């Protein structure tokens, strides 16, 4: 029996199994609360693999995609969760503090760098959204690479991407401790690491709902803080506020200037900080398997444009007008969570007596941002580990899912990495994390490149197999050209980072300086060939377009019904005023 292709009886079975993951286990209801809690950690009995799956005539990739599409996640995320995760989920220390390191390269270099990375990020999110809405499988875009490009490339992307989140977790825990130390330096930072570690781990044991509700609340705080800063910043630029010396405008763009010298090298230097600021913007697409409605994913992806335009570009312009790039405080921070190096604090503290109050306020915002990133680290890494286990690229124990849809082994591995946060008590902490981050430093650009390439390959496969673009659940606003632009931009960003690593700004070239930023390149090459050697496949370095699986796990089960619904929706939008049409296009 063909158990994987669209339109057959087993597809109905797959749909029933996937949808039933939100139904509680009846056998647990009669027990005590403690027993129900205990039993909830047992392996899910809802994820049933058909006995004839392994014996079917389908390809190995089709079998893997079926498994990824039928993982027993709970579909509980609503539109409000996804909207706030998309808007505020990536507003972290990269923006609130890391922006200062980029500003030291000049306001024009900062703006150009953020525009380039922001454009790249918009292309990436649109490409990932198209694939995630079409194939809402475990691991999302990280596993789509294996489906549309090559399994070894997919393994390299997924492992490096997961490693980046795993390493970020203990680093952000240390950030929580150091942020608290701004108010109280008498308590050992390791105590604060322990408190936040327990809080984050317990929070993730509440499942995806605990993650989503926490992110919803924290994102609101961050968004409000950004809006407050934008309003105050505009007033200060116009010459308002206490201790005002008059209209500022673009004063600092002329003196000390728009670019620090050397211009090109400083421009390339902004790419790293910009990538750090935008990193995780694609996280909302990872929730596709736990979302109530796929359309909520597409709407959240459309909001990326406004998030980039308002929260990043507008903020960058205001910061560039309020703080000169040669302000020594920009590079005076003792660590990546030092509030004194925040350009937000520097800009507002120039108002005089407000300085101390502003520092306290921004420290609260930064603490909220760091806790939010910690939460995202455990969520993202645990889901990626589970997907790698389900696809057979990691030991099968990694795919363990309990009855509440929690990837417990993935959460446990994240927790194990979190223990590295106690290195805050060591004098070698900075050096250790410098080299840990070097393991995945450039992997963000590589991951983004592969996401865009996956969308291009998806469109090419549709054409090669005589299929129409009309069956795409959500089409990227930029189409396939957005994927092409994303690939080009990310390739240029990788080249720029390699260049500035080989010839760093303000210091001589050295192997140590180069590998601090580019160690991930040889690491990825080794991982790629190690996986290919393990598979013993040296004949096929990419999947042929005609052989790409376009059916397994596809959200469009009834093509004719889907087309009718799309046509009705288009007719409804066509009957609305022009402003509504614009709203639906961008939101």
Curated annotation (Swiss-Prot):
Which residues are annotated with the PTM Phosphoserine?
10, 27, 44
Does the UniProt entry include the keyword Glycoprotein?
yes
Per UniProt, subcellular location reads as: Membrane; Endoplasmic reticulum
Outline which residue ranges sit on the Cytoplasmic face: 1-80, 130-162, 208-219, 288-302, 382-406, 453-475, 531-587
What are the annotated glycosylation sites? 184, 243
Could you mention a single GO BP entry for this protein? amino acid transmembrane transport
Name the source's superkingdom: Eukaryota
Keyword Iron assigned to the entry: answer is no
Show the InterPro entries listed in the entry. AA-permease/SLC12A_dom, Amino_acid_permease_CS, Amino_acid_permease_fungi, APC_YAT
Q: Where is this region: Disordered?
A: 1-31
- Transmembrane feature ranges: 81-103, 110-129, 163-183, 187-207, 220-240, 267-287, 303-323, 361-381, 407-427, 432-452, 476-496, 510-530
Any idea which UniProt keywords this protein has? Amino-acid transport, Endoplasmic reticulum, Glycoprotein, Membrane, Phosphoprotein, Transmembrane, Transmembrane helix, Transport
Segments in the Extracellular topological domain: 104-109, 184-186, 241-266, 324-360, 428-431, 497-509
Q: From the Swiss-Prot or TrEMBL record, what is one GO molecular function term? A: putrescine transmembrane transporter activity
Chief location of this protein?
membrane
- Here the segments flagged for biased composition (Basic and acidic residues) are 1-18
How does it sit in the bilayer?
A: Multi-pass membrane protein
Annotated GO CC locations = endoplasmic reticulum; membrane; plasma membrane
Q: What else is known?
A: Present with 1300 molecules/cell in log phase SD medium.
**According to its UniProt entry, what is the function of this protein?**
High-affinity S-adenosylmethionine permease, required for utilization of S-adenosylmethionine as a sulfur source.
Give the family, as the similarity comment puts it.
Belongs to the amino acid-polyamine-organocation (APC) superfamily. YAT (TC 2.A.3.10) family.
Listed name of the protein: S-adenosylmethionine permease SAM3
- Gene label: SAM3
């Amino acid at each position: 029996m063909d158990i994987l292709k669209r339109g057959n009886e087993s597809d109905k079975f797959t749909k029933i199994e996937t949808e039933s993951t939100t139904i509680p286990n009846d056998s647990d209801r009669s027990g005590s609360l403690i027993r129900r809690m205990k039993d909830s950690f047992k392996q899910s009995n809802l994820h049933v693999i058909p006995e004839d799956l392994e014996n079917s005539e389908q390809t190995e990739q089709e079998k893997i995609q079926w498994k990824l599409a039928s993982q027993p996640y709970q579909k509980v995320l609503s539109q409000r969760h996804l909207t706030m995760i998309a808007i505020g989920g990536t507003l972290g220390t990269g923006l609130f503090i890391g922006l200062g390191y980029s500003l030291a390269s000049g306001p024009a270099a900062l703006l150009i760098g953020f525009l380039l990375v922001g454009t790249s990020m918009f292309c990436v999110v649109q490409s990932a959204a198209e694939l995630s809405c079409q194939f809402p499988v475990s691991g999302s875009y990280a596993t789509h690479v294996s489906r549309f490009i090559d399994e070894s490339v997919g393994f390299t992307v997924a492992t490096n991407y997961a490693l980046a989140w795993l390493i970020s977790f203990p680093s952000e825990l240390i950030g929580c401790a150091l942020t608290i130390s701004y108010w109280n330096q008498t308590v050992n930072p390791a105590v604060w690491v322990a408190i936040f570690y327990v809080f984050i781990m317990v929070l993730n044991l509440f499942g995806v709902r605990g993650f989503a509700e926490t992110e919803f609340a924290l994102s609101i705080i961050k968004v409000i803080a950004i809006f407050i800063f934008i309003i105050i910043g505009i007033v200060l630029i116009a010459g308002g506020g206490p201790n005002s010396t008059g209209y500022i405008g673009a004063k600092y763009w002329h003196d000390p200037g728009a670019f620090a010298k050397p211009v090109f090298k400083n421009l390339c230097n902004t790419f790293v900080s910009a990538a750090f600021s935008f990193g995780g913007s694609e996280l909302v697409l990872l929730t596709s398997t736990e979302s109530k409605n796929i359309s909520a994913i597409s709407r959240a992806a459309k909001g990326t444009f406004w998030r980039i335009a308002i929260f990043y570009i507008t903020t960058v312009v205001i910061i560039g007008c309020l703080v000169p790039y040669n302000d020594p405080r920009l590079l005076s921070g003792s660590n990546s969570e030092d509030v004194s190096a925040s350009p937000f604090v520097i800009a507002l503290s120039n108002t005089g007596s407000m300085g101390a109050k502003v520092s306290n306020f921004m420290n609260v915002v930064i603490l909220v941002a760091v806790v939010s990133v910690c939460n995202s680290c455990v969520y993202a890494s645990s889901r990626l580990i589970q997907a790698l286990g389900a696809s057979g690229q990691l030991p099968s124990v990694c795919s363990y899912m309990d009855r509440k849809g929690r990837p417990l082994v993935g959460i446990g591995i994240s927790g194990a990495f979190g223990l590295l946060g106690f290195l805050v008590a060591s004098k070698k902490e900075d050096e250790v994390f410098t080299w840990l981050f070097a393991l995945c430093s450039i992997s963000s650009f590589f991951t983004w490149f592969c996401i865009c390439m996956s969308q291009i390959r998806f469109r090419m496969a549709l054409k090669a197999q005589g299929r129409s673009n009309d069956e795409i659940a959500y089409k990227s606003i930029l189409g396939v050209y957005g994927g092409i632009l994303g690939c080009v931009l990310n390739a240029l960003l990788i080249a720029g980072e390699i260049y500035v690593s080989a010839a760093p700004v303000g210091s001589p070239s050295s192997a140590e300086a180069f590998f601090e930023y580019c160690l991930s390149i040889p690491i990825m090459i080794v991982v790629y060939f190690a996986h290919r050697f393990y598979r013993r496949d040296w004949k096929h370095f990419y999947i042929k377009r005609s052989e790409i699986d376009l059916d397994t796990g596809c959200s469009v089960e009834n093509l004719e019904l889907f087309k009718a619904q799309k046509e009705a929706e288009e007719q409804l939008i066509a009957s609305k005023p022009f402003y509504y049409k614009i709203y639906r296009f961008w939101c």
